[in-house]
Swiss-Prot record:
PANTHER family: LYSOSOMAL ACID LIPASE-RELATED. Monomer. Glycans are attached at N34, N99, N159, N271, N319. The gene is Lipa. Keywords: Glycoprotein, Hydrolase, Lipid degradation, Lipid metabolism, Lysosome, Signal. The lineage of its organism: Eukaryota, Metazoa, Chordata, Craniata, Vertebrata. Residues 1-25 form the signal peptide. Pfam families: Abhydrolase_1. Expressed at low levels in most tissues. High level expression is found in hepatocytes and splenic and thymic cells. Very high level expression is observed in cells of the small intestinal villi, the zona fasciculata and reticularis of the adrenal cortex, pancreatic acini, and renal tubular epithelium. Glycosylation is not essential for catalytic activity. This is Lysosomal acid lipase/cholesteryl ester hydrolase. InterPro entries: AB_hydrolase_1, AB_hydrolase_fold, Lipase_euk.
Length: 397
């Protein structure tokens, strides 16, 4: 892998040597900032909190307790929790400019905004007893995110704010773990006022794109290719590429196309001046086991717990020889859902099936021209989506 990386960097260097001078844009300062620094750069108060899960992981949660102009409002603010998708982190909600990022818009609308980070991403790489160098640290998938991360994060927020309920907004895998947690743990579901679902991925029957090709490979081969620990974390090489490649006018489009190749194409709706910021925060990493789990969702055509590879191991974990399926029909939360017509991962045909399984669906909107990333980075997201989210949450106060 190291040799391939050197060859790639060398090739990029040759390409850049042929790019005319004067075509390099300035590096955005947010490239070198953490999430709290990005929040504060735009004039908002920013906080970082540490949450201990039941199985010993230490997660970071970022908070925007109020907007820029409503410092002195009386009484507690309604709380909203934002949960990122696969290979992402809390920065997703604040890496557009202030009037285009959901995190900032919610704060200005009077909400107390909390942004989670799943175990294994850039901001959640700690454990009480385990080190990231140990295989045991990485023995998790979205099962554990639903079983441990969400309850710990939600209960921490409720204890900190004194609230009894929160709004939950999920994107992609952030929806997946919400559906699992709220259908499996009714006591946790009682703490959610409304479930707002953006581009949910629960099945991959109709999904497409290069990322899905990994799901066709046998698990042992994937482990040989990627190991058993971390998958696609932020790294020094990625940051170098973001700063030295993605700031070139000609190369920005190439950097953006990496995202489009994975998620679907809607080139005109991405703020190209922010590409270097996006790529220095995403991908943010996950475990190889989590990627194997998504491969199993693709192969088995259903949402179920992780298959440990043998009847004996499954029996040890589940008291049965095969992994149990998740029944989201058990979830009884008011749910609003938004989908995209060009979304390769949350395909509209999978969404159509999902809609029939949500007992308390209160709203659905499909945006025909949107891909998977428009929900977090789309230039038109403020008026096509975020205004509706804010209106619905205020309606359900």
């Amino acid at each position: 892998m190291q040799l391939q990386g050197l060859v790639f960097v060398f090739t990029i260097g040759i390409l850049l040597s042929r790019v005319p001078t004067g075509t390099v844009s300035a590096v955005d300062p947010e490239v070198n900032m953490n999430v709290t620094e990005i929040i504060m750069r735009w004039g908002y108060p920013g906080e970082e909190h540490s949450v201990l899960t039941g199985d010993g992981y230490i997660l970071s949660i970022h908070r925007i307790p109020r907007g820029r102009k409503n410092h002195f409002g009386k009484g507690p603010r309604p709380v909203v929790y934002l949960q990122h998708g696969l290979l992402a982190d809390s920065s997703n909600w604040v890496t557009n400019i202030d009037n285009s990022s959901l995190g900032f818009l919610l704060a200005d609308a009077g909400f107390d905004v909390w942004m989670g980070n799943s175990r294994g991403n850039t901001w959640s790489l700690k454990h009480k007893t385990l080190s990231v160098s140990q295989d045991e640290f990485w023995a998790f998938s979205f099962d554990e995110m639903a079983k441990y991360d969400l309850p710990a994060s939600i209960n921490y927020i409720l204890n900190k704010t004194g609230q009894e309920q929160i709004y939950y907004v999920g994107h992609s895998q952030g929806c997946t773990i919400g559906f699992i947690a709220f259908s499996q743990m009714p006591e946790l579901a009682k703490k959610i006022k409304m479930f707002l679902v953006l581009a949910p991925v629960l099945s991959l029957n109709f999904a497409s794109g290069p990322l899905l090709q990994l799901g066709r490979l046998p698990d042992p081969l994937l482990k040989d290719m990627f190991g058993q620990k971390q998958f696609l974390p932020q790294s020094a090489m990625l940051k170098w590429l973001s700063i030295h490649v993605c700031t070139h006018v000609i190369m920005k489009e190439l950097c953006a196309n990496v995202f489009f190749l994975l998620c679907g194409f809607n080139e005109k709706n991405l703020n190209m001046s922010r590409v270097d910021v996006y790529t220095t925060h995403c991908p943010a990493g996950t475990s190889v086991q989590n990627m194997l789990h998504w491969g199993q969702v693709f192969k088995y055509r259903k949402l179920q717990a992780f298959d440990w590879g043998s009847s004996e191991k499954n029996y040890f974990h589940y008291n049965q020889s095969f992994p149990p399926s998740y029944n989201i029909k058990n979830m009884r939360l008011p749910t609003a859902l938004w989908s995209g017509g060009r979304d390769w991962l949350a395909d509209i045909n999978d969404i159509t099936i999902l809609l029939t399984q949500i007992p308390k669906l209160v709203y659905h909107k499909n945006i025909p021209e949107w891909d998977h990333l428009d929900f977090i980075w789309g230039l038109d997201a403020p008026w096509k989506l975020y205004d509706e989210i804010i209106s619905l949450m205020k309606k359900y106060q």
